[in-house]
């Protein structure tokens, strides 16, 4: 949506996401286990694990649950025998789409992802077909806040950029490995974020109209319903006017 942060866009779809909360928790736990398996159980020394912990807490997962998942990864749980796979493709209206998966069966995963693209008027691309349009960043989001205060604290903590949106939301962008450190510094300054996550930020946007926007939303929903899909990133831009018709 034009003039809104990624977090605001996420909240726009919150009702649908709440219905998927069980599946979301399962995916977060899988990422916690895998991150701990690959990089150790200390979030301060393992940026991927720290990002997973931040995401778990942003989704109201209890400390007990996430600590058990980390312990499973450190202990070599079978769920840790997963590999990260990134699929790239084109969605409705020529949108660039990246699909991050954790899978123990590439054939199963690619079949599910390809099916979602084909059902929604898109197509799966080759490696590198759209990746050049995205940059991996940490995104720390505030629904409201004083821009000058947040900007000063964020830049002092090592953030790369601070963006204010039309609805008053503020996003702080960081190198993805530094997101946890910057978030800690902001909290130490009395600035508690509403969300923190590692994301793929597009360098260009594709405007969605009343015809293509519903198709893009359907593609995102179908992909997120796949058990192996962890995250879906895209460069579709949906205006407030079009969003009101969805």
From Swiss-Prot:
Keywords: Cytoplasm, DNA-binding, Transcription, Transcription regulation. This is Probable transcriptional regulatory protein CKO_01097. Gene3D superfamilies: 1.10.10.200, 3.30.70.980. PANTHER family: TRANSCRIPTIONAL REGULATORY PROTEIN YEBC-RELATED, TRANSLATIONAL ACTIVATOR OF CYTOCHROME C OXIDASE 1. It is found in: Cytoplasm. Belongs to the TACO1 family. One of its GO terms (cellular component) is cytosol. GO terms for molecular function: DNA binding. GO terms for biological process: regulation of DNA-templated transcription. InterPro entries: Integrase-like_N, TACO1_YebC-like_2nd/3rd_dom, TACO1_YebC_N, Transcrip_reg_TACO1-like, Transcrip_reg_TACO1-like_dom3, YebC-like. Residues 1-20 are annotated as: Disordered. It comes from Citrobacter koseri (strain ATCC BAA-895 / CDC 4225-83 / SGSC4696).
